[in-house]
UniProtKB/Swiss-Prot annotation:
Organism (species): Picrophilus torridus (strain ATCC 700027 / DSM 9790 / JCM 10055 / NBRC 100828 / KAW 2/3)
Any GO BP annotation: translation
Keywords: Ribonucleoprotein, Ribosomal protein
Family: Belongs to the universal ribosomal protein uL29 family.
Keyword GTP-binding part of the UniProt annotation: no
PANTHER family linked to this entry: 60S RIBOSOMAL PROTEIN L35/50S RIBOSOMAL PROTEIN L29, LARGE RIBOSOMAL SUBUNIT PROTEIN UL29C
InterPro entries in the cross-refs: Ribosomal_protein_uL29 (IPR050063), Ribosomal_uL29 (IPR001854), Ribosomal_uL29_CS (IPR018254), Ribosomal_uL29_sf (IPR036049)
Gene3D superfamilies per record: 1.10.287.310
Region (Disordered): 30-49
Protein name in UniProt: Large ribosomal subunit protein uL29
NCBIfam families hit by this protein: L29
Length: 65
């Protein structure tokens, strides 16, 4: 599920941290499956996860200001 910045800005800091950790975990799973020689379940999934992580980090930085 894609999360847009607007939805992320409405989340609390704790929710953002939870979302970030779950995204990093799913990216790790995708990378490990590819490293073991398997084909990725969806070729664009890793890119999508990386972008979602970037969105979460951006919103977290915005909230610090």
């Amino acid at each position: 599920m894609e999360l847009r910045a607007k939805a992320l800005r409405e989340m609390s800091d704790e929710e953002l941290n939870e979302k970030l950790s779950s995204l990093k975990e799913s990216l790790l799973r995708e990378r490990s499956s590819v490293a073991m020689g398997g084909a990725p379940s969806s070729p664009g999934k890793m890119r999508s996860i990386r972008r979602q992580i970037a969105r979460v980090l951006t919103v977290m930085e915005e909230k610090k200001r």
